[in-house]
UniProtKB/Swiss-Prot annotation:
InterPro entries: aa-tRNA-synth_II/BPL/LPL, Ala-tRNA-lgiase_IIc, Ala-tRNA-ligase_IIc_anticod-bd, Ala-tRNA-synth_IIc_core, Ala-tRNA-synth_IIc_N, Ala-tRNA_ligase, Ala_tRNA_ligase_euk/bac, DHHA1_dom. The lineage of its organism: Bacteria, Pseudomonadati, Rhodothermota, Rhodothermia, Rhodothermales. GO terms for cellular component: cytoplasm. One of its GO terms (molecular function) is ATP binding. Its cofactor is Zn(2+). This is Alanine--tRNA ligase. It holds the Pfam family tRNA-synt_2c. It comes from Salinibacter ruber (strain DSM 13855 / M31). It is an enzyme of class 6 (ligase). The gene is alaS. Zn(2+) binds at residues 646, 650, 750, 754. Its main location: cytoplasm.
Amino acid sequence: MSHDPMNPHLQSSADPSRSSEEIRQDFLQFFQAKGHEVVPSASLVPDGDGTLLFTNAGMNQFKDVFLGTGQRPYSRAVDTQKCLRVSGKHNDLEEVGHDTYHHTFFEMLGNWSFGDYFKAEAIRWAWELLVERWGLAPDRLYATVHEGDDDFGLSADAEAYDLWLSETPLPEERVLYEPSKENFWMMGDTGPCGPCSELHVDLRPPEARQETPGRELVNVDHPQVMELWNLVFIQYNAQTDGSLEPLDDQHVDTGMGFERMVAVLQGKESTYDTDLFAPLLQAMADRSPREEIRGYDDLHIEDDDEHEQVRIALRVVADHIRAIAFAISDGVMPSNEGRGYVIRRILRRAVRYGYQTLELEEPFLHRLVDPLIEKMGGPFDGLAEQQEFIEQAIRSEEESFLETLGTGIEFFERVVPHVTGFQDTDGEESDRLLGALREDAQAMDLLEKAYVDTDDENDILHSFARTARGGTLPGQIAFLLHDTYGFPIDLTRLMARERDLDVDMEGYETLMDRQQERARAASDFAVDQSDVQAWQSVSPGEASVFVGYDRAVVPDAEVRAVRVVETGDTQQYEVELSRTPFYAEAGGQVGDTGTLRFGDESVQVLDTQREGERIAHTVDTLPEPLDGPVEAAVDAERRNHIRAHHTATHLMHAVLRETLGDHVQQKGSLVAPDRLRFDFSHFDAVDEDTLRHIERRVNTAIQQNIPKQEARDVPIDEALDRGATALFDEQYGDRVRVITFDPDFSMELCGGTHVDATGEIGLFRFLSEGSVASGVRRVEAVAGKAALEHVESELETLTRARRQFRSLHTSLPEAIAEVQEERDRLAGEVDQLRRGQLSDQLDTFIAENAASVDGITVVTGRLDRASMDDLQELGQQFRDKLGEGAVGVLGSVGEDGEKAYVVATVADDLVDDGALRAGDLVGTLGDRLGGGGGGRPSLASAGGRDPEALDTVLDGVPALVRDRLE
């Protein structure tokens, strides 16, 4: 974002008209022509990988292949992978916007070989694409190779070095040996690893290149000498002792930053100057009221320090909307936990930049989704399919944060000058500043809210000053911004850094820990306080083998281990068996119950839970001896009810997605014998007609008696490739079970129990629909016997109601409507009588409550149980009875006791003289009642939420009139 974003030193290859879509497609087609399978991008949420918060590299979806635990039906692949780097080692958040090339969300182009080609082909094809196909100047390219590592016992990668010289025209002076930090890749402390070979480009002008050779600037973070492509040669397996063993199969893993490559090929100095970001920047410029960027199609803001914050803000928001929209499209909703909190932090960071720097005070981020989809909806169709949902999710978050953002910024701005004032001061100057802070009533009020550990003003002042002298914002301030105003800590740190201040993170984290401890203590009542003893072995052999998919009874199980569980005065036991038909609670499905028969003695299994690899059966008593065969029998009737509800959940999930959209993802569930509960991502309430449609569609699938198709031990990637639905945030193993009811209707990864055909369910009925969190809805429903009982109960209710109305009408809806009409008529008569009574009271009311203020008659008083409508209707009568030279104020507390109302009247002669206006009076009165109001100069009304203040407010009317007259 400068006056001339074109880089004149790449004109031989640069073509501003070459679109990012063409470049992306050209990369994929180049490798497809060389036998590579074009693979779609994986989700930003890694499938079954609990070690990653977000997908942050192209290799994530192929990790199982490198580890030797998975396979693909192809040995060569090419893709563009959505990536997000916002946490841990790979965290680019702080750099975003402050330079011209870091991003939170980015695309990684890559080509892959799984035991197929190796270094020679990877090097040759990289050169062919960059130089021969895309036309990059060869004399601007540098290659790096691994210099070796004594700690690993590795010599230099002479093979790669020689290949760069033999497969390309690169001279020796532009092939550089680099250390392991730059040129050796490891998946972790152990596992697949190998040397890297990188391609760098020198974009500097000729005079700069002559002055300093490019080889001296490789890998030193020079903005114009940058890495373009990393070729990783995976050929070793790191051992726990630090040694490296050669792999049987050698792999190639390459990664090219798409945004950076587009900038080079379009001849732009910044990735933000490319066509990937231009529509987003222009959309912001069009909406911002700041004159220096409005109307500038090319956004060429003056290059001076004054406008640097504007440039940073534009870049930050353009970057962040991509991360936010793509994350939501992949099922990550902004929240206070895990991945959701990361997205909420990014979103609030963007809103703050827009609000404070671009002066966008209304929700604006959601409006950037449309230009984003226009640019990227083609290769990533999930964006376009979920556009409305993404926009709703973002707007809801914006509106929520904007409610507190302005106040939080005012708080920050009020306190920060005092922090900077104390910086590096002592002695008399410090005493003077303490005095000034003490006199700043607003700042002191804020500090008293922040420093909750003391109410001593001197303690607060001196604690604040001690921290501030070091140029540090106190942790108490940061915590209040977080806890009261919703400021993520990294946003507060960013705002502090803009003022050259640090944040007292130790103090902040102490307060956060204390808050979490309080939350844990408050929920202790809900925590299992059981005293669980260690498992005691009973017999050796295989244990906890689940066979419940195929049978409900195991006649000859053996007890492998037991333990005692004490809860208060209650003692229970948990039993582990060799084989068991009992399903342990998982995936929302409750655990099985049933019996364990030890010879002639039976004990009830009250619950079944999983603990690691163990399946624990809870019983109240434990027979002796335990070393004989045990018959394990599931309560078959209860199991059947659970199966019906679980399969109904799958059918309903499929219909929800079919009806509401692909954005619907499961967020939680309960599958019990008597009901099901299902939480899913969706913003709007599901109306009654839509619920009935979904219900009918599920019942149609039940009537079709669709048979269950079950596939066990399926490689997870194969299952996903078939189109199976994986539940968001669920952790899966490498091999999974797939439950299908018609491949075109419902196919899910699932470990639960199901009916053999949908007809066994019988019936499905919704019970309720509502909201449980922002963007998350909940439905409750019943199936099978429970649904039949629910329908019977509804019919019984209707029958009783029909009996009640039999004398009125044979049609129940018409009878109810007739009663409602009569009720409304009588209510109207009651209202009319009440208002008549109030009107009759006015003469007495005026006589008893009149006072004189500077020759003006002022009448105030209460007419309780009068509504706002009552007061407004009486107001005109009141005014007419008072006549000239009079002011009247009537007050009332509503029937619910929660609100107070006032109506004010001012005679025409007083209005004409300009002495008094009813609207001015109720403005003050409404404010004193905790609300507001308005109206005409002669008649106005107000309301508020502080009914207890009404008498005081009315008593103050004469003084208010006197003040207005003066």
